[in-house]
Amino acid sequence: GSEMCIRDSYVPSLYEVTYKEDGTIASFEPIYEDVPKTIQKQIVLNMTEAVYPEKPVVPFIKATQDRVVLEIQRGCIRGCRFCQAGMVYRPVREKNVEHLKDLAYKMLKSTGHEEISLSSLSSSDYSELEELVNFLIDEFKGKGVNISLPSLRIDAFSLDVMSKVQDIKKSSLTFAPEAGSQRLRDVINKGLTEEVILNGSRLAFEGGWNKVKLYFMLGLPTETEEDMKAIPQLANEIAALYYDTVPKEKRNGKCQITISTSFFVPKPFTPFQWAAMYTPGDYLARARVVNEGVHAQLNHKSIKYNWHEADVTVLEGILARGDRKIGQALLKVYEKGGIFDAWSEYFDYQRWEDAFAECGIDTDFYTMRERDLDEIFPWDFIDIGVSKEFLKREWKNAHDEKVTPNCRMKCSGCGAMKFGGGVCFENKD
């Protein structure tokens, strides 16, 4: 009997991989003539008409995600060079605002949840955000429904919205500059300047906020000690701004600035897929630079610093860019009792190290080397719409510290236009 395959689903056994002596891929070929050489990403172009759960299941027990989640758009126009979602979900497709109002009403009515969260990769870029948020406030605020807006840029509009939907005394502002210095922010194409951060903070402090969370990554390509030291310096400037902006009698205690750093892991389908990683010791040394920098600041009493475990980062790096050889090690870890390893209390790095050793896998091969531009990657047979040529250009732009504009400012020819919809065709009527 013959079996049918759904178009563009990947069946590993139908492809054969050969390797060079150095362990990199020599070829990746289908074993039958009628098997496609590349797998094309399938995409829903009309997000408004796509099925969305109007009656999400509500569990008997209290769940962590105890709220209605409303997706307002898919994709992101920003093009941060470290971000996989921003590349994989191109092009941006918005949902119609009237449809979203209707969905919000139906979902809140059917679940009885007391919170609605607007979900997207960058909510501030949703073109009808103001109308949607004002509708939700007018319609549901009086009924005891909280409105949560993750991934907002901090500006006058979002602060105005947040002051309407949050308890200012309890809530904090979140910025994700990702890198401490402007130079490194240009390398990663994160279009957030110090001016924007300080201006947003000042407006927030004037509005009564006094808690700020800052998120950064350590170990980004081209990072220097100067870039690391810029992280506590930025936090100190924000703290100084609070004490300059808010007169003593109006202060709600001292300001609290929390810096959190994670260690950067290069991901497939991003401009940084060629980047090298570091050893756990090197990562922790970077965190130490930041920690010492925090203690050296004038306002160090207002600054708190959290950092990640480094061995989890290295493991994530192996899994993120691993090939099919890693599969056997995964099975071994499971056989050794590794099941809830994403929970720190169950995580045992030794178990992973043993599994890799037993399979004869040199993990440094996946983490410690910068890839050649012409290397064939284990995921190259998947066509996500964004071309490898575009990613190469962006990898070069990163090293040249050149910023690429977002999709609404200017098309950079990433390849996603071939899907025939979304942001690529927004203003082409």
Regions found by a protein language model. Name each.
Residues 62-98, 413-428:
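Canonical Radical SAM [4Fe-4S] cluster-binding loop centered on the CxxxCxxC motif
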Residues 1-6:
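Short, small-residue-biased leader/transition segments that mark boundaries at the very start
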Residues 12, 18-69, 385-397, 426-429:
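N-terminal [4Fe-4S]-dependent radical SAM core
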Residues 23, 32, 296-429:
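Radical SAM enzyme core and accessory elements
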Residues 56-84, 108, 149-150, 171-172, ...:
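N-terminal pre-triad scaffold of radical SAM enzymes
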Residues 105-258, 262, 266:
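Conserved SAM/AdoMet-binding glycine-rich loop
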Residues 16-20, 127, 157-161, 183-188, ...:
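Flexible glycine/acidic-rich beta-alpha junction loops that bind and position SAM and/or redox cofactors
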Residues 65-69, 81-91, 113-121, 180-187, ...:
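Glycine- and acidic
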